[in-house]
């Protein structure tokens, strides 16, 4: 608190003055302590001791506040790196970031409302003079400052005179060594979205709350740093320790290295390999966390499961295929959540409150009571100590993730920036499925067709009569599953194609865009299946193909009436009722005669059909062969 007072973030008064402050509220204070970071005071503006109470956050609204846009920051930062590489294909690109000290505190409260944010610690009453960490409007209120800074810094970034002005700061920054003649720079390519840097003398800045992220070539980087510092001082005031704290956090300038490889927002970026990955510190931390989930462990609490899932989701931000590794863990945590909610609601005090709530339905006080009760149930749910048990499938998943994190050289944990940013795809495929067969193609390159085995046809809705509550419904092979198989086969075909013909793409990490007319199968490319066991099994197969694969994958939806050729290919099957034949197909689409046909390997098909029939997890066992192209065209 002495530090807060020294920085003039608050006004300390004798605690007896609290009796004269009309709008004083009970607001708990907390302290967030993280190793390697400064401790942060937290102001809990959502606390209410009972349902009649009104907390400060209930009096505030974000509807009239500036829109928060920092969620897009990291993607924009990656795109700026991509454009820099287009313009500077063989020049080192350096990364840096600086932040604002006491960011939210720079937004000052009006004197008429400042007292409402007061709190008492020991024998002193503290009145915050600026935004608090815990108010729902603090992030929104800082947005104008953040946006003003990046625009002003961009405007100033072509000025060379600023470097001398801040030489005393920038000279203390350590820079990585220059690349030697053997250094390889992974390339980026122009497209309709990214055309390179328009003004090479200017720098693009992206703010994530109070962190300003930027990238630039080595010769320009010092000027970019100077412009960032100048913009901050113009907006928040130049250093004057007798009046206020220096708004610039100098830790980044004095204690970190400006390099081609840097940890930004918790993710390791590398501009030479044009990739992002889990940091080594985080990898070891996750291994330490997973070591407590050893094979002899039998159970876990809801909070323990949620914390683990949170760590894995963070990992998935840098390796998208990770989301397909812990289906059972996610299901077990969700089941534990439902169980803990039920246990909490069955407590006597909660039941009593719920009865009172039902009796006051329609009254003005009902909404306040309901909000208070829901908050209490949610809070107590995560404190519930009811045990959830680790089954065999979950144990296998934990073992699998430990194995992957323990062998980073065998399992590539890097993801190319080319697979993350929004850009024009290098390959485009179309696919479709019916209950009899599936097919797909990439225009002017290849096509493929597979008729489903009779065992699978027998389990489709066409031949299996089920209802939602029927046990037989678990055996059902839905059209969603068949459409997802088509997407996997399209991905396998492009993987084989690029491996055999790497010159088809202008860079090392192509992106496949697969068009599908099924929304569920589209979502399964980036989101884990929640309910269907067979969908989870298929996602595990896709995961095994994606690991160490230079080809990226994304899916988009196309209207069924526009997906004509893929639909016709999938409608060809052996049946007296089928009106379509390959002969008719080639007559209607003569261009297909010059395309190669892709044949999925029997090993890959066996994996996929096993997933459709049994839903059993195959583990991470990627097929040794995905398939081949028949160069003898027109052979069916």
Residue spans for each PLM region:
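Polymerase palm active-site segment centered on the conserved acidic dipeptide of motif C
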Residues: 68-75, 97, 161-176, 185-200, ...
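RNase H catalytic domain
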Residues: 206, 492-564
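C-terminal reverse transcriptase regions that engage the nucleic-acid substrate
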Residues: 127, 258-418
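A short, polar/acidic, helix/strand-boundary loop motif
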Residues: 123-148, 183-188, 445-485, 520-529, ...
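Inter-domain linker/hinge segments that demarcate the starts of reverse transcriptase
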Residues: 1-20, 74-83, 144-158, 221-242, ...
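Catalytic-core region of right-hand nucleic acid polymerases
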Residues: 5-157, 269, 277, 281-328, ...
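C-terminal functional segments of enzyme domains
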Residues: 263, 268-272, 550-604
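Flexible, glycine/threonine-enriched loop-and-boundary segments that flank and lead into catalytic domains
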Residues: 16-18, 182-196, 402-435
């Amino acid at each position: 608190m002495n530090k807060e007072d020294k920085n003039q973030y608050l006004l300390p008064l004798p605690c007896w003055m609290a009796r004269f402050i009309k709008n004083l509220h009970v607001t708990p204070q907390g302290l967030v302590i993280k190793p390697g970071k400064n401790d942060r005071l937290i102001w809990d503006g959502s606390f209410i001791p009972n349902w009649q109470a009104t907390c400060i956050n209930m009096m505030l609204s974000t509807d009239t506040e500036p829109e928060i846009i920092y969620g897009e920051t990291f993607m924009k930062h990656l795109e700026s790196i991509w454009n820099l590489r287009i313009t500077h294909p063989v020049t080192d690109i350096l990364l840096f970031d600086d932040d604002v000290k006491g960011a939210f505190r720079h937004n000052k409260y009006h004197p008429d409302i400042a007292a409402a944010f007061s709190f008492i610690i020991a024998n002193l009453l503290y009145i915050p003079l600026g935004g608090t960490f815990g108010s729902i409007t603090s992030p929104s209120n800082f947005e104008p400052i953040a946006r003003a800074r990046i625009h002003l810094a961009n405007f100033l970034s072509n000025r060379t005179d600023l470097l001398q002005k801040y030489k005393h700061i920038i000279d203390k920054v350590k820079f990585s060594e220059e690349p030697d003649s053997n250094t390889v720079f992974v390339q980026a390519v122009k497209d309709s979205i990214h055309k390179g840097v328009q003004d090479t003398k200017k720098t693009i800045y992206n703010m994530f709350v109070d962190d300003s992220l930027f990238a630039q070539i080595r010769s320009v980087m010092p000027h970019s740093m100077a412009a960032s510092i100048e913009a901050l001082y113009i907006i928040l005031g130049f250093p004057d320790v007798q009046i206020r704290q220096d708004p610039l956090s100098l830790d980044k300038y004095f204690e970190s290295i400006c390099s081609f490889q840097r940890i930004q927002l918790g993710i390791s970026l590398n501009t030479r390999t044009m990739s992002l990955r889990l940091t080594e510190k985080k990898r070891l931390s996750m291994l330490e966390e997973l070591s407590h989930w050893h094979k002899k462990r039998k159970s876990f609490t809801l909070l323990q499961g949620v914390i683990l899932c949170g760590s894995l989701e963070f990992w998935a931000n840098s390796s998208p295929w990770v989301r397909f590794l812990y289906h059972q863990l996610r299901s077990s945590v969700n089941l534990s959540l439902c169980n803990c909610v039920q246990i909490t609601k069955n407590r006597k005090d909660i039941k009593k409150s719920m009865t009172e709530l039902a009796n006051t339905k329609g009254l003005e006080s009902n909404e306040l009571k309901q909000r208070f009760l829901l908050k209490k149930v949610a809070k107590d749910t995560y404190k519930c100590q009811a045990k959830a048990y680790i089954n065999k499938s979950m144990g296998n998943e934990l073992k699998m993730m430990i194995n992957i994190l323990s062998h980073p050289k065998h399992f590539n944990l890097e993801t190319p920036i080319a697979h993350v940013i929004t850009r024009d795809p290098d390959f485009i495929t179309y696919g479709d499925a019916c209950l009899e067969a599936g097919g797909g193609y990439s225009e002017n390159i290849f096509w493929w067709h597979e008729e489903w085995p009779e065992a699978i046809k027998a389990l489709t809705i066409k031949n299996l009569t089920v209802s939602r509550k029927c046990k037989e419904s678990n055996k059902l092979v839905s059209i969603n599953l068949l459409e997802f198989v088509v997407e996997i086969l399209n991905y396998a075909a492009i993987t084989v194609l690029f491996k055999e013909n790497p010159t088809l793409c202008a860079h090392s990490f192509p992106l496949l865009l697969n068009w599908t007319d099924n929304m569920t199968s589209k979502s399964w490319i980036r989101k884990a299946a929640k309910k269907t066991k067979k969908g989870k099994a298929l996602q595990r197969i896709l995961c095994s193909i994606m690991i160490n694969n230079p080809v990226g994958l994304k899916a988009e939806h196309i209207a069924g009436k526009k997906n004509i050729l893929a639909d016709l290919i999938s409608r060809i099957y052996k049946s007296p009722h089928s009106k379509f034949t390959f002969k008719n197909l080639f007559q209607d689409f003569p261009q297909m005669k010059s395309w190669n046909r892709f044949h999925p390997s029997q090993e890959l098909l066996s994996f996929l059909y096993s997933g459709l029939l049994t839903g059993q997890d195959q583990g991470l066992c990627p097929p040794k062969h995905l398939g081949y192209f028949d160069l003898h065209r027109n052979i069916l």
